[in-house]
Design a protein with these regions (language model features):
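Active-site-proximal mixed secondary-structure blocks
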Residues: 1-34, 38-136
Length: 136
């Protein structure tokens, strides 16, 4: 079979969908569902999320420099999907999806989602402008 050459694109699927919670320094918080996330480095431990600058959560992330990657479950699939197609500019995702914002143990602003079994607390070390998305 001959090799096929495809134009550049996103070919690494499936990607994990996670709910990212963040807040600005005034306490305004939001949840954004992202699938562009992964490990960057083992030592020091680092991961990334990629977010479009026009997204509501982008300015919150940039202001506080904090976010939490919240791993989801089957039970949270509706909330995971819903938080990815609604904007925090228009709705309170915490209230609408009956999710609980909890206090992070190592962050000052970004809350954890209590209903998620794993909450990975993160501090932004760099914002890399890549094109359509910026990597935190």
């Amino acid at each position: 079979m001959a090799k096929q050459i495809w134009k550049p694109g996103n070919m690494l699927y499936p990607l994990p969908a996670v709910m990212v919670s963040t807040a600005d320094k005034s306490g305004k918080s939001n949840i954004i569902t992202v699938a562009w996330t992964g490990t960057v480095c083992t030592n020091p431990a680092m991961l990334y999320i990629s977010v479009r600058p026009e997204r509501y959560s982008y300015d919150l992330l940039k202001d506080s420099g904090e976010f939490v990657v919240n791993l989801t479950t089957e039970k949270l699939k509706k909330a995971t999907d819903w938080c990815g197609v609604r904007s925090g500019r228009d709705v309170d995702k915490w209230k609408e999806m009956h999710l609980t914002a909890g206090r992070a143990s190592k962050l000052d602003y970004a809350p954890i989602i209590e209903e998620c079994p794993v909450n990975i607390e993160c501090k932004v070390t760099e914002i890399k402008e890549l094109g359509s998305h910026h990597m935190f």
